[in-house]
């Protein structure tokens, strides 16, 4: 038999107080409105005894909010997005906010569907890593509810934004390694239309230039950010060269995953290749193959996204609407 949900009315009757008094106490306003301490303690004791939980629907009706935030990402299996989502969910949980997560599979049509689903669920705000070609839909949506873009900036959007500065650390990483590989340094990237792809290629090109090396067009190979694309691009490159490349930069952790899988399957993990990548993973410390990386601070990315969306939901104007965060370099080659 289904257990009856305990209501404020039930608690009020057991405590011998009015429903209004019980409601004030359970909503944390009893002391402020001079409800006697003994009465407050009696109401709270009965609520604890019955494991009372306030209705989120009633709370939403009172302040016209759903206390939910939507997060839209290309794929949750991506290590960077997974860590970001975990950090953001913890921040939301601590604030009593529910985080709703949807994936787009890098498909603009699917992105429109999941965004509309979020709107239908009346989220208070949305944080989006968009695969759209431009920000037109989000400019329109931002008139209806707060929107924060992260990781990607479609067509130099003026919307609130949180991103890692990809160019500066990538340039520094490559400039320090390139002098050892002046005759050959390959770049495997994702979709060229996405801002992270462009920024990381810009940093790669600048790093070569700082080392006095001109980028050769054939060194740049683009696909998408799925591990299978990294596998296929690296396989084609090895077939083209008849050997593994001497030096390689992958523009994301997923691409490097595909490269490592190919190398493992073809017994190339002990080959003489200098691997570098944007994005770090704790497992890289356990590999015999050393990998130098640009490491994003996903905790800071999540905090700044949460800070921006929270202020916008409250109707405040953040001091800085577009935030570019620094990254660190992880050198594993001696």
From Swiss-Prot:
Superkingdom: Bacteria
Tell me which UniProt keywords the record has, alphabetically: DNA-binding, Plasmid, Repressor, Transcription, Transcription regulation
Q: Which Gene3D superfamilies match?
A: 3.40.50.2300, lambda repressor-like DNA-binding domains
Q: Which GO terms describe its molecular function?
A: DNA-binding transcription factor activity; transcription cis-regulatory region binding
Q: Name one GO biological process term.
A: response to fructose
Residues annotated as DNA-binding are 8-27
Mention any Pfam family matching this sequence: LacI
Segments forming domain HTH lacI-type? 6-63
Under the heading InterPro entries, the entry gives: Fruct_sucro_rep, HTH_LacI, LacI/GalR-like_sensor, Lambda_DNA-bd_dom_sf, Peripla_BP_I
What PROSITE patterns does its record include?
HTH_LACI_1, HTH_LACI_2
What role does this protein play?
Repressor for the scr operon. Binds D-fructose as an inducer.
Q: What's the protein name?
A: Sucrose operon repressor
- Species whose genome carries this gene: Salmonella typhimurium
State the organism's lineage. Bacteria, Pseudomonadati, Pseudomonadota, Gammaproteobacteria, Enterobacterales
Corresponding gene? Answer: scrR
């Amino acid at each position: 038999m289904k257990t009856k949900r305990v209501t404020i009315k039930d608690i009020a009757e057991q405590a011998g107080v009015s429903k209004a008094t019980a409601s004030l106490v359970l909503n944390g306003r009893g002391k402020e409105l001079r409800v006697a301490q003994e009465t407050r303690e009696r109401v709270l004791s009965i609520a604890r005894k019955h494991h009372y939980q306030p209705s989120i629907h009633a709370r939403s009706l009172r302040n016209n909010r759903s206390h939910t935030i939507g997060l839209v990402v290309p794929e949750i299996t991506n290590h960077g997005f997974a860590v970001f989502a975990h950090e953001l969910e913890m921040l939301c949980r601590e604030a009593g906010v529910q985080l709703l997560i949807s994936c787009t599979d890098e498909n603009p049509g699917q992105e429109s569907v999941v965004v509309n689903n979020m709107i239908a669920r009346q989220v208070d705000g949305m944080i989006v890593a968009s695969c759209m070609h431009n920000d037109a839909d989000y400019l329109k949506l931002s008139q209806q509810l707060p929107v924060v873009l992260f990781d990607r900036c479609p067509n130099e959007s003026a919307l609130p934004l949180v991103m890692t500065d990809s160019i500066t650390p990538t340039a520094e990483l490559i400039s320090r390694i390139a002098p050892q590989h002046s005759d050959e340094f390959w770049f495997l990237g994702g979709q060229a239309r996405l801002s992270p792809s462009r920024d990381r290629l810009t940093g790669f090109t600048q790093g070569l230039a700082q080392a006095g090396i001109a980028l050769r067009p054939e060194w740049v190979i683009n696909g998408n950010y799925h591990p299978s694309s990294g596998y296929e691009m690296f396989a084609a490159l090895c077939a083209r060269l008849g050997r593994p490349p001497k030096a390689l930069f992958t523009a994301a952790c997923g691409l490097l995953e595909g490269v490592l899988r190919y190398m493992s399957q073809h017994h190339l993990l002990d080959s003489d290749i200098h691997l570098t990548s944007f994005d770090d993973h704790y497992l890289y410390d356990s590999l015999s193959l050393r990998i130098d990386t640009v490491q994003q601070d996903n905790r800071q990315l999540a905090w700044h996204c949460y800070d921006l969306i929270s202020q916008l939901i409250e109707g405040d104007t953040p001091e800085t609407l577009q935030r570019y965060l620094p990254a660190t370099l992880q050198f594993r080659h001696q």
